[in-house]
Amino acid sequence: MKYAFIFFLTTLFYTNPKNTKNETYPPFIVFQLFTSQGCSSCPPADYLLEQVKKNTSNSNVIVMSYHVDYWNRLGWKDPFSKKIYTELQYEYARKFNSSSVYTPQLVVNGNEHFTGSNKSKLKRSLRKYTSENTSNAIALSNIRKKGRLINIDYKIKGDLNDKIVSFALVLEEKTTFVKRGENSNRKIKNSNIVINQVSLPIQDKANGNTSLNIPEIFEVNDNYRIIAFVQKPNLQITGGIQKSL
């Protein structure tokens, strides 16, 4: 089954003629996984996200892991968890008319959500969003890393009305030995872990620069990448890009 999935990803980006359509802006897809090392249902979703990252070379297929903090009470404090990511998940819950949140939850382009370990729905999302026009494109340039400070220049194309642009610093990969809680005595590998994120109103300014800091708990020389995406007020993502440091 694993190899069939890898074959699916490979053929999707190398043989699907829809990817060669002459569009104003290339298709993209952003997978935002809300996960926790304290949740026993999350490792299969973490693994599936890892496979998407590992087996697609297309820079417009973007995966992000947001570690929420509400399962820390079960005995294991997820070292990557932040309250702000729980708050972001509740923003999506309001959009989807839900009064509660769950893990693992996979949000796709801010438009839809499903259980993060659902491979068939993930495949359908890949087919759908990698063949659709997009209203924004982002270019990142002149990325400078000095110590813990990362500076980024950016340029956004397309409709900018009422939109915001977000920049996330993600840790490419980390394996953690979980000592307590539902995943006690397990090694869990997480991919593209969001460790810092800033959001800016675009306000008709297509060009700009911003900066992100590597938090003190992380090593300066670990492998990181920058992810940028544009959103409407309703949280729909209308453009995205990523670059490794």
Question: Language model features by range: what are they?
Answer:
Residues P17-S100:
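Active-site-proximal cofactor/substrate-binding loop regions of enzyme domains
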Residues P79-Y102, N111-E112, G116-L245:
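Short, conserved sequence motifs used for protein processing/export or organelle targeting and
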Residues F8, F13, D46-K53, V170-K174:
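Short N-terminal helix-initiation segments at or just after the protein's N-terminus
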Residues L106:
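Ligand-binding face of N-terminal immunoglobulin V-set domains in extracellular IgSF glycoproteins
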Residues M1-Y25:
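Bacterial Sec-dependent N-terminal signal peptides
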